[in-house]
Structure formats: C-alpha cells, structure tokens
UniProtKB/Swiss-Prot annotation:
Signal peptide: none
Pathway: Protein modification; peptidyl-diphthamide biosynthesis
Domain J, first and last residues per copy: 13-97
A biological process from GO: protein histidyl modification to diphthamide
Pfam family, one: DnaJ
Gene Ontology annotations for the cellular component aspect, listed alphabetically: cytoplasm; nucleus
Family indicated by similarity: Belongs to the DPH4 family.
Function as written in the Swiss-Prot or TrEMBL entry: Required for the first step of diphthamide biosynthesis, the transfer of 3-amino-3-carboxypropyl from S-adenosyl-L-methionine to a histidine residue. Diphthamide is a post-translational modification of histidine which occurs in elongation factor 2.
Organism in which the protein naturally occurs: Emericella nidulans (strain FGSC A4 / ATCC 38163 / CBS 112.46 / NRRL 194 / M139)
Name this protein carries in UniProt: Diphthamide biosynthesis protein 4
SUPFAM superfamilies assigned to the protein according to its UniProt record, in alphabetical order: Chaperone J-domain, CSL zinc finger
Domain DPH-type MB: 120-184
Length: 188
C-alpha cells in the first residue's frame, strides 16, 4: 500500500536552491556564480522585498525551483554554491541526488528511464572495496554474505564502461545478491 495522500516534505536540492536545472552538465562557473548571487539577493532578509518586486524572468532552460513555502537560508545557498563549484563534490552530489530520486520515483519508468531498484540492494562506495592492482588491470572486490570472499568483483574496464553514470550494479558470482558501487572519475 502506497501513501499518496500527503505531499513529501523534502528539503530542496542545491539545484533548486540556486534555481538551476538538474542535471546541468554544461553549467559554467560564471553561470553558477550568477545563480548564487541571484539566490543571495532573493533570499537575503534585507534584500528579499526589493527583489520580489522586480519579478525576474526565468531562464529558458527550465530551472528547478524550490516549493514557494520553503525558507531558504543564506547558509544553504552558500553550501549549495560551494558544493556545485567543486567538480568532485558536484559529481558525488549528483550521484546521490539521482539515487535518492530513483528511490522516491520507484526507480525508473516503463520507457527505460532511470535504473531498476532491487529490494535489499546494498549501495557502497568504490573506496569500501578491496583493490588488487596486480596483473593487467586493477580489480576491486568485496566479500558477499554467501561466503565468497571475492563475490562482488569488478575491473577497471567495468568502471570505464559506466564512467558517465558513476555507478555500477554488480552481481555476486556465488549467489543471486547484487550490490551497487558508486564511484567518481577523477581527471589527472
């Protein structure tokens, strides 16, 4: 039985706080800075009245907006800006945001959008896996509760294949369990 009678009370995403579209792959540092300054002006207690009267036009690319009854703090705006300004933090935040939205939305639709949600799917970070760098390419592995010490195994080429999504679902080689591994691609 699902609950649909009450609207979920969620905090706005960093993209909603800064009135930016998600995902925003082509977002420049200048666009981010402009959005940050607009958000500060819009939500600052001393400036909010003046900005509300201006009724600024929205952009054509369909930015996400927080619910109008949400109170956005200056600290939240600053945190959003700092997180989205750092490429590594932003990639991690985007992954977590996608994962959370998949859980809320039932993890995909009948058109193949989104990912399939597996009940009991354990989500881990690549750093939580053991790494074996001997041989032609690095291998990451993790023990499964079925007893196989290297039940969940993946190679560097597996990670490269899924670099755009930053996540990969791996099945145990000894049983029917799956785990989702999250990772970030770092440019050297």
């Amino acid at each position: 039985m699902t609950q649909t009678s009450a609207a979920p009370t969620t905090t706005p995403s960093f993209y909603e706080i800064l009135n930016l579209p998600f995902p925003s792959t082509g977002l420049s540092k200048q666009q981010l800075k402009i959005a940050y300054h607009k958000a500060l002006l819009k939500h600052h207690p001393d400036k909010a009245v003046a900005v509300a009267k201006e009724n600024l036009p929205s952009s054509n690319h369909g930015p996400a907006q927080p619910p109008s009854n949400q109170k956005i703090t200056i600290d939240a705006i600053t945190t959003a800006y700092k997180t989205l300004s750092d490429p590594v933090q932003r990639a991690e935040y985007d992954r977590v945001l996608r994962l959370d939205r998949n859980r809320v939305n039932g993890a995909g639709d009948k058109n193949g959008n989104g990912t399939v949600f597996h009940t009991g799917l354990e989500v881990v970070d690549l750093e939580d896996l053991d790494c074996d760098e001997g041989g032609d390419e690095a291998m990451w592995y993790m023990a499964c509760r079925c007893g196989d010490e290297r039940g969940f195994s993946l190679s560097e080429s597996d990670l490269e294949r899924e670099a755009d999504s930053g996540e990969i679902v791996v099945g145990c080689r000894g049983c029917s369990l799956y785990t989702k591994v999250l990772f970030a691609v770092q440019d050297d």
